[in-house]
Amino acid sequence: MKNIGIYAGILLLFVVLAYSFTPQVLDGKIVNQSDIASWKGMANEAVTHNTANPDDPTAWTNSMFGGMPTTATIDDFDGDWTDAIYKFLLTGRRPASYLLIALIGGFLLMLSMGTSRLIAVAGAVAIAFCSYNMQIIQVGHNTKMQAIAYFPWVLAGVIFTYRMAMRLPVAAGNDAKGDWKTWLPKTILGATLFAFALSFQIKANHPQITYYLAIVIFAYAIGQFIYLCINKDKRFLLRNFFIASALLLVIGTVGIATNANKLIPTYKYTPYTMRGGSELTSDSDSHNSKGLDLDYATAWSYGIGEMPNLLIPNFNGGASAGELPLDSETGKLLKRAGQPNLKQTMKHLPLYWGPQPFTAGPMYMGAITIFLFVLGLILCKGREKWWLVAASVIAVFLAWGSHFMWFTRLWFDYAPMYSKFRTVSMALIVLQTTMPLLGFYVLDRILKERYDKQALKKAGFIAYGITAGFCLLCTLMPGIAGSFVSSSDAGMSDIIVDALAADRATLLKKDAIRSLVLISCVFALILWAFRTPKTDAVGKDGSFVLKGRTVIVAAAVVLLVWFDLFSVGKRYLNKSHFITPKDFTAHYEPRLVDEVIHQDEDPDYRVLDLSVNTFNDAIQSYHHKCIGGYSPVKLQRYQDLIERYIAPEIKSFYGMADGAVTISEIEENLTELKVISMLNGKYIIVDPGAAPVYNRYAYGNCWFVDSFVPAVTPDEEIALLASTDLRTTAVIGNDFPAAQSFFAAAQKDTDDALGASGCHPESSEGSPDRITLTSYAPNELRYDFSTDSERAAIFSEIYYPEGWKAWIEPAGTYGEVRGGHYIPTENAKQIDLFRADWMLRGAILPEGEGELIMRFEPDSYQLGENISRASSIFLILLLIASAAGVAASASASRLSRKGSTR
């Protein structure tokens, strides 16, 4: 009961710490997150539809890039029973709830390593409050933050499982076959808890963080295996190691499978995205046909020279848009120059001068954490160090990216799935766990007097000399950091650059002094604690209990770590970043141009918004079905289309607009925007406060074509768009032989008719055949058509093979939608869609009148839901059974002890 009270108190402390960092959430305010604003923009169409049609939710949106699956946007999937637990853990005001989850996970991880509770609290604070977490919260990378928050939970499950399996009450060489009751129940429980934690971590939906987590897990498992192999007296535990490994693998797979409702659709979608690579062969040497372009993936590589940021937050200036006081050199200069809005200007200065394009801030791990980590490298021996060192080194090498290209290319070309990821500097999040874990593990052992006094002093002064000595050196000679000049300074006058450089040097010196003081305080506390006489510090249960000065030291370290990370974190997430929900919705207030466009009653057309960053802005998608948008997982064929045609056509449009006097004059000259018109780009926004440019040449929702041009390769297929009249002729790739055969047969009939009559048959433009869009929903399109013969229709809709289905219904009829699936009438016929004009949908329509129904119903969703449901039910039952097994084993053990004492 006493322990329950202690843990409840620690939980309450974590709640206080989380909410004290973001007290604004208690007033109902939210973080003004740019990425969340973008998410609401890209998700608005799907969310609106799903709210109005809960029985027929959409997995497709036309709001950006012509249309794409919502797999990476909407996470409202059915089937997973563990999702309720996941959402319960997120109870509370965000982002405080994210910090609370990270604190609890860090605490559990430290306990799994055998640390005392007070040191575990310090380690939890060090893990949860790293400055990078605050930066990603501020910009809105919520899924990344959730994935990082569950990182220590998963690792704690792994460590607990192996420790339970290998903590036997028998000596080496004894028969261990009959002692399974002492370790197997807890091992199964540990593996089950690991599976739950892994399930939650994957639910956060950030595969790159999960990938880094897998590296750490493998490092730990391999480290334990090597330890058992090289120690003869421990080899008898290899059996338990393999059993624990098998349990983690099997039960962990079940945990992963609870997310099948999300993973399977994502697995199906990824090969078609930018992360699946381009089919084109004419790209640069850095192109990876099975993943992202190498230059694109490594654009954000952490500089080798900026690694001291881990110890000194402003070593490279901090953030790309940072704040300086008015009495700084830059402030004085701008004040003398009469800079308007000086106070506002001083809040957004280019202070970062490192090699990355720009950054929200440094990967500051905490001066105290770095000192303790270095101390651990020197003092700690054996298995608890080397797996952490290995994981940390791999993470650092990966984060260096383009600055350590041979290693990066090795992983990019040969490591499974690694080529799907970008922003490689993110790998340093591994250090947010490994560094505190080793550092505070060693501090715990120091306070438990596990080290020789002389060895501790020697190691302590070496670690102090390395860390505090470097800080002192930066204070006295800041020039060792570099020139304090950034490549982004090139457009500024020399006098401003000189002022900025002076201020950057000042920032470095101040933070170097700050880190020096913090390290000195902790080292002094350690020396003070170690000077005390050895006392009896063993509890009733045989565990070590901190007493006397050690308690004071541990508590002081908790406070110092909190102060260190709290104060730096506030630089990147503070009250200025919080706004009311009402103010947040102002992002989506319709502009004048939006209101004009909304007057169009056509249910399906596209808008090209040039008043924003067209292909890096998703807020435009809140109001319109856009040709642009923002998504790191857009369809690769669409990205190819942007690069080959849409971007050049936009450039051509600007050229026309520059020479025009009126909007009407611009509209007259839009005939060259072939691909934009093919995508039914009906409106072009230039000025948000004026009427849009109307593209009268847009092809519309659908049209008939009479002929085709075959393309043998993807390169030929995309190139033919330039030379083909897409209104009358379709470009068809060789991967659609049935469509090519239809066109070939139709062309033969045309030639035969020409030979028999001596004149051409009636063209499409003069034909009475018609096709009209009659109903629009993001996941369903209905068309009414009438033809005198079989005809090929092309639709200004994006082709995607994994889910779009089509039926021909008799004229005036429609089946029913049941459980999100279309049930056709008995007279309906399902037909195949084909890809035309690089990425549009095409269909062969029968002779006569009828209704064409297109619906997005990917089979992967139903399969995923079934697997998720079965896996989550099994996992919940296994948790109950394993917990009951541990309780029964503990009860039997107590009865056995009572019997032996009688």
Regions found by a protein language model. Give the residues of each.
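Transmembrane-helix motifs of polytopic, lipid-linked glycan transferases
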Residues: 97-114, 369-372, 438, 523-524
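Extracytoplasmic/lumenal acceptor-recognition loop(s) of multi-pass membrane glycoenzymes
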Residues: 44, 50, 54-76, 80, ...
